[in-house]
Amino acid sequence: MNKPRKGDLRVWWIPQVPMKSFFVPVGNLHEAKLILDTLADYDMFQLKNNIKPDFSNAGGLQVFNGDDWYTWYNHEGNDFDTVADLLDSE
């Protein structure tokens, strides 16, 4: 994996809390929403089809600030969950 650059985005996902998270680099907010929705749908599919008895997942979007990864917020201070709802209406 290439060294991250300032402004790079990545999705983080924990399929079963308290497991470690894994990360998926994304190019924009639409890609992030697609990945997060797909991972959530996959977990729900596994539950509904008795592949796993239950789950407690978590996920989100991070941005690299040049030194470390931080939770992504837009310029108005909204988190990704709030902004993702707006992406559906575009």
Regions from the PLM with identified roles:
Residues 3-19:
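Short aromatic-glycine-(Arg/Gly/Cys) micro-motifs in beta-strand/loop hairpins
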Residues 19-30:
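A short, exposed loop/beta-hairpin motif centered on an aromatic-Gly-Thr core
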Residues 33-81:
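Acidic, low-complexity, intrinsically disordered interaction modules
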